[in-house]
Every structure is written in structure tokens, then in C-alpha cells.
Swiss-Prot record:
Listed EC numbers: 2.8.2.1
Binding residue positions for substrate: 113-115
Functional summary from the UniProt entry: Sulfotransferase that utilizes 3'-phospho-5'-adenylyl sulfate (PAPS) as sulfonate donor to catalyze the sulfate conjugation of phenolic compounds. Can also sulfonate estrogenic compounds, however, the dietary flavonoids (phytoestrogen) and environmental estrogens, like bisphenol A are better substrates than 17beta-estradiol (E2). Mediates the sulfation of doxorubicin and its analog epirubicin, two antitumor anthracyclines.
GO biological process: 3'-phosphoadenosine 5'-phosphosulfate metabolic process; doxorubicin metabolic process; ethanol catabolic process; flavonoid metabolic process; sulfation; xenobiotic metabolic process
Organism from which the protein derives: Homo sapiens (Human)
Protein family membership: Belongs to the sulfotransferase 1 family.
Cellular location(s): Cytoplasm, Cytosol
Gene that encodes it: SULT1C4
Binding residues annotated for 3'-phosphoadenylyl sulfate, in chain numbering: 55-60, 137, 145, 200, 234-239, 262-266
Domain of life: Eukaryota
Protein's recorded name: Sulfotransferase 1C4
Main location: cytoplasm
Reaction(s) catalysed (UniProt annotation): a phenol + 3'-phosphoadenylyl sulfate = an aryl sulfate + adenosine 3',5'-bisphosphate + H(+); 17beta-estradiol + 3'-phosphoadenylyl sulfate = 17beta-estradiol 3-sulfate + adenosine 3',5'-bisphosphate + H(+); bisphenol A + 3'-phosphoadenylyl sulfate = bisphenyl A sulfate + adenosine 3',5'-bisphosphate + H(+)
Length: 302
């Protein structure tokens, strides 16, 4: 779809945005069309960036980080929906606008969001020595969550059947590319830059400990009472009911929650309800090959 067609694009509940490649990574066409602007994004030293592979706990981490910065003031986080509070750097969606424009209009300090692999990160974020939080999730649960997200999100390609999507994901032919390369790229970068690398499974198992770790990285000293408050307000059940965090304000023509809610399970080990024995064996074999060159390890269940 050409750029002039995209400008006239309107969601009607059936159409989906087209995709293309940027430096070998699949992206929505609108992102490809403004790639030079994204690459040349000018960061500020006090910008805080939250980076994840899609469906690895991004929204959860955003809410936690903002509550840490606001020292547990829940009302401040209710001022606007998630997508308005945290500019999504590389995203441009008809009717919702551009993350770049949002970021430019936002006063400092800004909390920014990206799903970009490390090698495609706008250089100024590293040049300005910005603090970056990366969250990684085990690939089996990540795949399941991404599959259901693509079912309901018309801004991304239709995923096809679960069997088809399983193959697409393994091949890395999804938006934002290969999960394996994404988590490894950020892992390799973490000791060279101001990057705090967290795991979704650790956040589920011991949220208070991980929130404390985040607070220390951000530079906030929070007492136990505030930490407990943040744990409560960022729990899955509370966030699922929070209209400022559950994406229910996005028009149904773009995100159809009747197909699958944005916040579906938020669990560790849900993949076991989707993977067949044969798929699991195939996945494990593929995982072993692709992860031999890293010490990065994941928990697939508790």
C-alpha cells in the first residue's frame, strides 16, 4: 500500500494495515514510510525508554514505572489512557497519530516505548545515555500472547490459524522480527549501556522485588507501603479492569476485544494449553539451535 493510500486509510473492522521491511525487520508500512524520522529521533538525557518484544509485559512495565516516578500516586496515572501517556516511538496509526509527534509534544521527563530490536534503536537514545528498561518473556508464552494479539489488532497482519502462526513465529516473520534475535541483541547490549534487563517471569513470581529493582534503577527510594501499593495497582486483575491501562479506549475497528481481550491471561505456562506435543518438541529443537550462542535462560513454567 503506497503512502498516499495510507493517508486515506480508515479502519472499518475488516481491513488491516499492510506491512513491509525495514533493514530486514517486518514493520507496519506506516512505520517504514517514516523510518528516517524514527532513526533520527532526538532523545533528551532524562528520557526513560521501556523496550520489549511485543506482548512481553510492556503495558505492565509502563504502569509500574510511572507509579514509581509518581511515588505511588494512582490518580496521576489515571489522567489518560496508556497509549497517550507513553509515546510509542515507531508507531504511526491512522486516526491515532504518531508516537514521534506525541514525544515531541510531551514535556520532560518522558517515558517512551519501543519494540525495536537493539540494532534499530535510534542512536541518540544511546548518545544521550538514556536509562533503558528491557523486559524479556519466555518465547512459548510470548508466542501465544502475540498470536491472540494479532487476532484482535487490525493494525497488524492477520495471524492465520495457530498452526500457521507457529511456523511464522519460528521463522521470525512477524512484526519486529525474530524473538530469539531480539532478546539476544538486547542481552548483549545490556552491559555496555544503561540498560536494566528484566524477566517477565521474575516480575510475576516476585513483583515487589522486581519493582524495588526498577525503583533503584530509576533513582527513587520508596518505602514498603508505597511498594505494596504499586504491586496491588499493577496486578493483572486490577489492570485488566483499569480503562486507562487495558486499551478499551481504542476503537473496536482497530482493537476488537470481543475477539480476544488486550489483557488476556498474563500467566506463565499458558503455552501448555496451545502447544501440541509435536509442536513443543519442534520448538525445543529450534530453540536449542538458535540460543546456543548465549547464556540467556528462561523459565517456561513455575
Amino acid at each position: 500500500m503506497a503512502l498516499h493510500d495510507m493517508e486515506d486509510f480508515t479502519f472499518d473492522g475488516t481491513k488491516r494495515l499492510s506491512v513491509n521491511y525495514v533493514k530486514g525487520i517486518l514493520q507496519p508500512t506506516d512505520t517504514c514510510d517514516i523510518w528516517d524520522k524514527i532513526w533520527n529521533f532526538q532523545a533528551k538525557p532524562d528520557d526513560l525508554l521501556i523496550s520489549t518484544y511485543p506482548k512481553a509485559g510492556t503495558t505492565w512495565t509502563q504502569e509500574i514505572v510511572e507509579l514509581i516516578q509518581n511515588e505511588g500516586d494512582v490518580e496521576k496515572s489515571k489522567r489518560a489512557p496508556t497509549h497517550q501517556r507513553f509515546p510509542f516511538l515507531e508507531m504511526k496509526i491512522p486516526s491515532l497519530g504518531s508516537g514521534l509527534e506525541q514525544a515531541h509534544a510531551m514535556p520532560s521527563p518522558r517515558i517512551l516505548k519501543t519494540h525495536l530490536p537493539f540494532h534499530l534503536l535510534p542512536p541518540s537514545l544511546l548518545e544521550k545515555n538514556c536509562k533503558i528498561i528491557y523486559v524479556a518473556r519466555n518465547p512459548k508464552d510470548n508466542m501465544v500472547s502475540y498470536y491472540h494479539f494479532q487476532r484482535m489488532n487490525k493494525a497488524l497482519p492477520a495471524p492465520g490459524t495457530w498452526e500457521e502462526y507457529f511456523e511464522t513465529f519460528l521463522a521470525g516473520k512477524v512484526c519486529w522480527g525474530s524473538w530469539h534475535e531480539h532478546v539476544k541483541g538486547w542481552w548483549e547490549a545490556k552491559d555496555k549501556h544503561r540498560i536494566l534487563y528484566l524477566f517477565y517471569e521474575d516480575m510475576k513470581k516476585n513483583p515487589k522485588h522486581e519493582i524495588q529493582k526498577l525503583a533503584e534503577f530509576i533513582g527513587k527510594k520508596l518505602d514498603d507501603k508505597v511498594l505494596d501499593k504499586i504491586v496491588h495497582y499493577t496486578s493483572f486483575d486490577v489492570m485488566k479492569q483499569n480503562p486507562m491501562a487495558n486499551y478499551s479506549s481504542i476503537p473496536a475497528e482497530i482493537m476488537d476485544h470481543s475477539i480476544s481481550p488486550f489483557m488476556r491471561k498474563g500467566a506463565v505456562g499458558d503455552w501448555k494449553k496451545h502447544f501440541t506435543v509435536a509442536q513443543n518438541e519442534r520448538f525445543d529443537e529450534d530453540y536449542k539451535k538458535k540460543m546456543t550462542d548465549t547464556r540467556l535462560t528462561f523459565h517456561f513454567q513455575f
